């Protein structure tokens, strides 16, 4: 087998020639990834240097080849519920739930009852979701008492969801100890969302009340307990392409199973409230590069896809995405699940439960 050159094509005089040469390079590079090679940081930076809508679509086409070969055509569908909202102790610059910069329009309430959560779990299952994530504000159970009542209540609710529905419960409760990770595992949690949000070097520009390493430690605790890590980040917070690539490389190093990619939808009153929304083609480029770096991972359209991508949402599913968060988000509205199902059908894709790394067989 002849390996693709690790260098991008040199410019030629004709735009058509340049595009054809770029396409050939991307095809060879994507085949290398399909064959089991790993993209280097230098190669990822070369992909990030691709400019122009037509050329970015060529990059997306190559990333889509990787997705088809390594993951198949099933799009993983999940839904979330904000089980406790507002008055958060952390100062994440993107979040309207923070007590440091509260949004008057962001809801504040205590832990929802088991009955309320079960009702929404059933609704999520009816909408086609295969997983249902219980999300809570706060730094996490790690900083609560060992017999924290709310943590115990969430564990009990997880057990009830398993007993009474066909949907798989996930959690996103913040930082956990190894012991708490084991409790979650024993309750039936098989996947836990805990995002890194940004690269190690950019993180302290977004949050100062805890560290990037704190988040990494929790991901490692979850993995050690046998829980799949649903760990990604947010694009469009002012980070560089190097930051985006370093985030993807960190996720590869941690061997996470699922990677939610949120596209910043700036919230009024937050430190990032005036941040310009990401250009949709930059979002597509980032999605494609993540797929090159993470060929077998579940890469998920998460918050902000409607606000940032608009009528171009379908292109993300042609750029490496193989999962979607359906329904509403934590503090913003999503589009109707029926629209998502129609979108998938129009692309010849099937909603369901996507394979984790190492599971897919063509």
Swiss-Prot record:
The protein's matches in PROSITE patterns, at most eight in alphabetical order, are given as: RADICAL_SAM (PS51918)
Enzyme class, top EC level, equals: transferase
Task: Give every Radical SAM core domain span.
Answer: 70-305
Decide whether keyword Methyltransferase is in the record: no
Q: What is its EC number?
A: 2.8.1.6
Could you give the cofactor binding note from the entry? Answer: Binds 1 [4Fe-4S] cluster. The cluster is coordinated with 3 cysteines and an exchangeable S-adenosyl-L-methionine. Binds 1 [2Fe-2S] cluster. The cluster is coordinated with 3 cysteines and 1 arginine.
- Record-annotated residues binding [2Fe-2S] cluster? 133, 170, 230, 300
- Residues involved in [4Fe-4S] cluster binding: 88, 92, 95
Gene Ontology biological-process annotations? biotin biosynthetic process
Per UniProt, which keywords does this protein have? 2Fe-2S, 4Fe-4S, Biotin biosynthesis, Iron, Iron-sulfur, Metal-binding, S-adenosyl-L-methionine, Transferase
State the coiled-coil residue ranges: none
Q: Which GO terms describe its molecular function?
A: 2 iron, 2 sulfur cluster binding; 4 iron, 4 sulfur cluster binding; biotin synthase activity; iron ion binding; transferase activity
What SMART domains does the record point to? Answer: BATS (SM00876), Elp3 (SM00729)
Q: Which cofactor does it need?
A: [4Fe-4S] cluster; [2Fe-2S] cluster
Q: What does this protein do?
A: Catalyzes the conversion of dethiobiotin (DTB) to biotin by the insertion of a sulfur atom into dethiobiotin via a radical-based mechanism.
Q: Which NCBIfam families match?
A: bioB (TIGR00433)
Q: State whether it acts alone or in a complex, and with which partners, per the record.
A: Homodimer.
- The identity of this protein, by name, is Biotin synthase
Its lineage reads: Bacteria, Bacillati, Cyanobacteriota, Cyanophyceae, Synechococcales
| Protein's gene | bioB
């Amino acid at each position: 087998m002849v390996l693709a050159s690790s260098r991008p094509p040199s410019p030629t005089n004709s735009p058509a020639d340049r595009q054809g040469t770029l396409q050939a390079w991307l095809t060879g590079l994507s085949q290398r990834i399909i064959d089991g090679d790993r993209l280097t940081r230098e190669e990822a930076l070369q992909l990030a240097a691709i400019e122009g809508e037509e050329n970015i679509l060529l990059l997306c086409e190559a990333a889509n080849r990787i997705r088809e070969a390594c993951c198949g055509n099933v799009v993983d569908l999940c839904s979330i519920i904000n089980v406790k909202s507002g008055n958060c102790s952390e100062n994440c610059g993107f979040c309207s739930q923070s007590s440091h910069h509260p949004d008057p329009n962001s809801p504040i309430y205590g832990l929802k009852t088991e009955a309320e959560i079960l009702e929404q779990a059933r609704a999520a299952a009816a909408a086609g979701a295969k997983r249902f994530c219980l999300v809570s504000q706060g730094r996490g159970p790690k900083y609560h008492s060992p017999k924290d009542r709310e943590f115990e209540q969430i564990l009990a609710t997880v057990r009830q969801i398993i007993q009474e529905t066909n949907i798989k419960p996930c959690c996103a409760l913040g930082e956990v100890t190894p012991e708490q990770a084991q409790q979650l595992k024993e309750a039936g949690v098989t996947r836990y969302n805990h995002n890194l949000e940004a690269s190690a070097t950019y993180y302290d520009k977004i949050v100062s009340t805890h560290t990037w390493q704190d988040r990494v430690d929790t991901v490692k605790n979850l993995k050690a307990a046998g829980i799949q890590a649903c760990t990604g980040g947010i694009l469009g917070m002012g980070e560089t392409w190097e930051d985006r690539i370093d985030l993807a490389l960190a996720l590869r190093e941690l061997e996470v199973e699922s990677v939610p990619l949120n596209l910043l939808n700036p919230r009024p009153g937050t430190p990032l409230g005036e941040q310009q929304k990401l250009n949709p083609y930059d979002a597509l480029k980032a999605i494609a590069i993540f797929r090159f770096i993470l060929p077998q991972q579940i890469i998920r359209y998460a918050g902000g896809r409607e606000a940032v991508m608009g009528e171009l949402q379908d292109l993300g599913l042609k750029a490496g995405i193989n999962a979607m968060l359906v329904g509403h988000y934590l503090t913003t509205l999503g589009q109707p699940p029926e629209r998502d199902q129609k979108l998938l059908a129009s692309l010849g894709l099937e909603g369901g439960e996507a394979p984790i790394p190492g599971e897919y067989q063509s």
